[in-house]
Curated annotation (Swiss-Prot):
Keywords: Cytoplasm, Elongation factor, Protein biosynthesis
Pathway assigned in UniProt: Protein biosynthesis; polypeptide chain elongation
The protein's name in its UniProt record: Elongation factor P
GO (cellular component) term, any one: cytoplasm
Annotated HAMAP family: EF_P (MF_00141)
The gene coding this protein: efp
């Protein structure tokens, strides 16, 4: 679907320079001289490179609609991650580097959303919050309750994050998978 350059919004996926790009930031600029334009920060969906482009209102670009499908994580085999389509039960194999460092948070039976363009996977979204166990954490020091200091901890998946001083090894916590930060202690319904 063709749209004008001034209609590009953050989150839109467009085809530009023969590749797929997602608009990260958009800023409508009206200079004193000349016509208005839309300053857009684009991120390439295939290799992650960034690009700043100016689109005039008269320019048209191709807006792309991505298909989003739910997949269930089955298992890891070497560097390959195997997922199953929740509707057709077909299996999809993706390389670990396609998911990135967040691949460590994948758990058996976890539902993820895969973005497809012409039946080819171009992106994956994990749940924003995941329950994990702390396997190693320094003991809390006396007198640290006054300041809001955090201590390093290692999770069951090998990821290192900062946790509050009252957290100890063996406890379940909720971690933000996007920012890789501690959110809260896990309760019974999170497990």
């Amino acid at each position: 679907m063709k749209i004008n350059g001034n209609e590009i919004r953050p989150g839109n996926v467009i085809e530009h320079q023969g590749s797929l790009w997602v608009a990260v930031k958009c800023n409508a600029v009206k200079p004193g001289k000349g016509g208005a334009f839309n300053q857009v920060e684009l991120k390439n969906l295939l290799d992650g490179t960034k690009l700043n482009e100016r689109f005039r209102a008269a320019e048209t670009v191709e807006r792309v609609r991505l298909e989003q499908k739910d997949f269930t994580f089955l298992y890891q085999q070497g560097d390959a991650l195997v997922f199953m389509d929740s509707e057709s039960y077909e299996q999809l194999e993706l390389q670990k580097d396609f998911v990135g460092e967040r691949a460590a948070f994948l758990q058996d039976g976890m539902t993820v959303t895969v973005e497809l363009y012409q039946e080819k996977p171009i992106g994956i979204s994990l749940p924003d919050q995941v329950a994990v166990t702390i396997v190693e954490a320094d003991p809390a020091l006396k007198g640290q309750t006054v300041t809001s200091s955090y201590k390093p901890a290692i999770l069951e998946n090998g990821i290192r994050i900062l946790v509050p001083p009252f957290m100890n090894a063996g406890e379940r916590i909720i971690v933000d998978t996007n920012e890789l930060i501690y959110l809260r202690r896990a309760n019974e319904k999170d497990k």
